[in-house]
């Protein structure tokens, strides 16, 4: 039988196809091995992605626009022009001094404030406790561990009381109850710092009588408050009047200091939450982030007290544990009230996204990440 011979053109075409297939297989093999190596090198198992690359610079620009803060600042300047007329004469000078200092710090955005929080928050507390006034062992040291206890009704579904009380510092929000038989096993009994927004301060202080009923945890527990209304410097002056910080000297009979958050910390928290809210809006609606303001009352939008308490704790603690943040359909909004609805001026879902990043990938957080703030965040854990 005669053997069949392929023509030269057919042989050439077959050879070209074979070479092409070999090259394709080789290239795919290279890509596969390269991808495996990148995944092994990436801390999150991804293909070598840097968390910081997730930051959307356009959202960063939009987050810097804060009409609510601008309105508060303008109102503060008008109060200064009017010499804070609502303040009783005996407290006016102190209130004006605090207001002037606060307004003077409003002009610049500085994430580096995170590195100053030990000096701004912990140092006054140490001085009050007699631990930080003379270069002692505790001076300049961060708290070894901090528990930030929120007010969510989900706290009643667990018994974290002993775990909470085991932290060096326990922070509670807006005078939520603790320590009695009803709540202690859920929320703990100890309190080392009360974090109040100034609306709460304004409701429990009576300037005309020079009375302050804001110390829900006792005279010896310091208060950290952020000013959402500049007029509340009057209530601050009243409540801080009996503290040692008002005289600048330690006094065993004096009440603990009432510390006002640095405006740079306020601005940092505002930008972080607005960034996450913008991102969530664009993702869920498919609309440009520039339309965010149409769906929110931009002049009222604000971060929650709990969010700022967590960020403040991250600045003064080596390890932060967070309890009572989150919601459940069967739980109250607050464990100690009958309120079931969230406040519209907060975007809690956006804050929850921030908390997830804070716990698992802090370098993905704009403004707060180390490359922006120069500050290395401590480990933060959230308990349900």
UniProtKB/Swiss-Prot annotation:
CDD domains: GT29 (cd19952). One of its GO terms (cellular component) is Golgi membrane. GO terms for biological process: protein glycosylation. Pfam families: Glyco_transf_29. GO terms for molecular function: sialyltransferase activity. Residues 1-5 are cytoplasmic. Residues 27-384 are lumenal. It is an enzyme of class 2 (transferase). InterPro entries: Glyco_trans_29, GT29-like_sf. Its main location: Golgi. It is a single-pass type II membrane protein. Its EC number is 2.4.99.-. It is found in: Golgi apparatus membrane. Glycans are attached at residue 241. The chain crosses the membrane at residues 6-26. Keywords: Glycoprotein, Glycosyltransferase, Golgi apparatus, Membrane, Signal-anchor, Transferase, Transmembrane, Transmembrane helix. Possesses sialyltransferase-like activity in vitro. Transfers sialic acid to the glycoprotein asialofetuin. The transferred sialic acid is linked to galactose of Gal-beta-1,3-GalNAc through alpha-2,6-linkage. Belongs to the glycosyltransferase 29 family. This is Sialyltransferase-like protein 3. It comes from Oryza sativa subsp. indica (Rice). The gene is STLP3.
């Amino acid at each position: 039988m005669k053997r069949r011979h392929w023509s030269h053109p057919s042989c050439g075409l077959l050879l070209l196809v074979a070479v092409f297939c070999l090259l394709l297989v080789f290239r795919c093999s290279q890509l596969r091995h390269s991808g495996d190596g990148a995944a092994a090198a990436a801390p999150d198992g991804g293909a070598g992605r840097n968390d910081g690359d997730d930051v959307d610079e356009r959202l960063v620009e939009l987050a810097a626009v804060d009409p609510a803060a601008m309105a508060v600042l303008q109102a503060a300047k008008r109060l200064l022009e009017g010499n804070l007329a609502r303040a009783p004469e005996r407290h006016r000078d102190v209130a004006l001094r605090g207001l002037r200092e606060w307004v003077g710090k409003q002009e610049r955005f500085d994430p580096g404030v995170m590195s100053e929080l030990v000096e701004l928050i912990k140092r006054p507390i140490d001085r009050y406790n007699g631990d930080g006034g003379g270069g002692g062992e505790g001076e300049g040291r961060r708290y070894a561990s901090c528990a930030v206890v929120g007010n969510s009704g989900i706290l009643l579904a667990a018994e974290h009381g002993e775990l909470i009380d085991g932290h060096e510092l326990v922070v509670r929000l807006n005078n939520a109850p603790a320590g009695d038989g009803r709540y202690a096993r859920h929320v703990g009994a100890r309190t080392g710092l009360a974090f109040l927004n100034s609306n709460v301060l304004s409701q429990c202080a009576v300037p005309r009588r020079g009375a302050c009923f804001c110390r829900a945890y006792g005279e010896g527990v310091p208060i950290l408050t952020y000013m959402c209304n500049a007029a509340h410097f009057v209530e601050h002056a009243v409540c801080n009047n009996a503290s040692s910080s008002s005289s600048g000297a330690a006094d065993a009979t004096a009440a603990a200091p009432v510390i006002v958050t640095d405006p740079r910390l306020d601005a940092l928290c505002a930008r972080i939450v607005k960034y996450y809210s913008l991102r969530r809006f664009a993702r869920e609606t498919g609309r440009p982030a520039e339309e965010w303001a149409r769906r929110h009352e931009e002049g009222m939008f604000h971060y929650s007290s709990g969010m700022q308490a967590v960020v403040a704790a991250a600045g003064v603690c080596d390890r932060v544990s967070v309890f009572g943040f989150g919601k459940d359909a069967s739980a109250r909004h607050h464990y100690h009230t009958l309120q079931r609805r969230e406040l519209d001026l907060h975007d809690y879902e956006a804050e929850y996204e921030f908390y997830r990043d804070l716990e698992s990938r802090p370098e993905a957080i704009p403004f707060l990440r180390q490359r922006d703030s120069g500050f290395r965040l401590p480990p933060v854990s959230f308990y349900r």
